[in-house]
Amino acid sequence: MFTARKASVEDCGLIREMACVAFPDTYKTILSPEQLDYMMERLYSPENLRRQLAEGHVYYIAYKDGTPCGYLSVQPEADDLYILQKIYILPRFQGVHAGSFLFRKAIEHIKQLHPAPCRMELHVNRHNKAVKFYERMGMRKLREGDFEIGGGFYMNDYIMGLEI
């Protein structure tokens, strides 16, 4: 059985611990080791996680039978637009519907904040197998782009969206 709870600053260590497994596993065949290191520091250093929470990112941690199995982050972008910043599942929990559980949790969170119709968007690397997952969850490709992230690196992403 899956459960989820909203994360607090005290959970930054747990989020980072899961990210150190899930993020490299997701991108090991897509990004260079140098870009992986750069992005891990940029996204998951303790100070950057605390900053994200202070800026309004809301993290949820998912559990399967009491064991942490993944996390998500949602951020309001505009009155009727929310960004699914992150959704990652530890490799050993992939294929057991943890991702769809967290995806639905993101929608539930947004609907609590914004009962009127709105849109959820996300960026996903064009070569990430998660593109198919997001399509199965009802998202569609809105546009694509190559976004400079510093350090000479780019994110080569689809921007996908879902009306909720």
What residues fall within each predicted segment?
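Extreme N-terminal starter segment of soluble prokaryotic enzymes
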Residues: M1-T3
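Acetyl-CoA-dependent GNAT
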Residues: K6-C12, E17-R92, F103-L113, K141-F147, ...
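Conserved glycine-rich acetyl-CoA-binding loop
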Residues: T67, L90-R104, P117, N125-K132, ...
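C-terminal "cap" of GNAT-fold acetyltransferases
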Residues: A116-V131, E135-I164
